[in-house]
Protein backbone atom coordinates (compact mmCIF):
# COMPACT_ATOMS: atom_id res chain seq x y z
CA UNK A 1 0.00 0.00 0.00
CA UNK A 2 2.74 2.50 0.95
CA UNK A 3 4.82 1.70 -2.13
CA UNK A 4 1.75 2.14 -4.34
CA UNK A 5 0.97 5.52 -2.74
CA UNK A 6 4.52 6.77 -3.32
CA UNK A 7 4.46 5.57 -6.93
CA UNK A 8 1.12 7.31 -7.48
CA UNK A 9 2.45 10.59 -6.07
CA UNK A 10 5.59 10.31 -8.20
CA UNK A 11 4.06 9.29 -11.52
CA UNK A 12 0.35 10.16 -11.70
CA UNK A 13 -0.16 13.33 -13.77
CA UNK A 14 -2.64 14.67 -11.20
CA UNK A 15 0.06 14.94 -8.50
CA UNK A 16 3.20 17.06 -8.28
CA UNK A 17 6.03 15.30 -6.36
CA UNK A 18 7.37 18.72 -5.35
CA UNK A 19 4.31 19.15 -3.12
CA UNK A 20 5.12 16.20 -0.82
CA UNK A 21 7.64 15.32 1.85
CA UNK A 22 8.45 11.97 3.44
CA UNK A 23 9.26 11.95 7.16
CA UNK A 24 11.22 8.93 8.33
CA UNK A 25 12.80 7.47 11.45
CA UNK A 26 16.52 8.27 11.63
CA UNK A 27 18.09 7.42 14.96
CA UNK A 28 20.42 10.12 16.22
CA UNK A 29 18.72 12.94 14.33
CA UNK A 30 16.74 15.57 16.20
CA UNK A 31 13.61 13.80 17.53
CA UNK A 32 14.92 10.70 15.68
CA UNK A 33 13.24 12.04 12.54
CA UNK A 34 14.36 13.39 9.18
CA UNK A 35 12.46 14.61 6.11
CA UNK A 36 13.17 14.29 2.42
CA UNK A 37 11.30 15.85 -0.51
CA UNK A 38 9.43 13.18 -2.44
CA UNK A 39 10.87 14.43 -5.72
CA UNK A 40 14.39 13.45 -4.54
CA UNK A 41 13.74 9.78 -3.86
CA UNK A 42 14.06 6.64 -5.95
CA UNK A 43 12.17 3.43 -5.15
CA UNK A 44 14.00 0.12 -5.40
CA UNK A 45 12.53 -3.08 -3.96
CA UNK A 46 11.67 -2.40 -0.30
CA UNK A 47 13.85 0.70 0.05
CA UNK A 48 13.76 4.37 -0.85
CA UNK A 49 17.02 5.94 -1.88
CA UNK A 50 17.98 9.55 -1.29
CA UNK A 51 21.54 10.40 -2.33
CA UNK A 52 23.54 7.74 -0.45
CA UNK A 53 20.81 7.14 2.14
CA UNK A 54 18.77 3.91 2.14
CA UNK A 55 15.35 4.28 3.77
CA UNK A 56 13.47 1.02 4.42
CA UNK A 57 9.71 1.34 4.01
CA UNK A 58 9.13 0.33 7.65
CA UNK A 59 10.93 3.51 8.78
CA UNK A 60 8.60 5.88 6.95
CA UNK A 61 6.56 7.81 9.52
CA UNK A 62 4.48 10.19 7.39
CA UNK A 63 3.86 11.49 3.91
CA UNK A 64 2.67 15.10 4.03
CA UNK A 65 1.32 17.50 1.41
CA UNK A 66 3.33 20.69 1.89
CA UNK A 67 0.71 22.92 0.27
CA UNK A 68 -2.19 22.12 2.60
CA UNK A 69 -0.62 20.13 5.46
CA UNK A 70 -2.70 17.03 4.68
CA UNK A 71 -1.17 13.80 5.99
CA UNK A 72 -1.61 11.15 3.29
CA UNK A 73 0.10 8.41 5.29
CA UNK A 74 0.88 8.09 8.99
CA UNK A 75 2.51 5.06 10.57
CA UNK A 76 0.41 3.60 13.37
UniProtKB/Swiss-Prot annotation:
It comes from the Archaea. InterPro entries: MJ1316, UPF0248. Belongs to the UPF0248 family. This is UPF0248 protein MmarC6_0667.
Amino acid sequence: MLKELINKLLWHPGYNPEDYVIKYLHRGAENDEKSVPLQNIVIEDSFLFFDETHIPFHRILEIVNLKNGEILYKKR
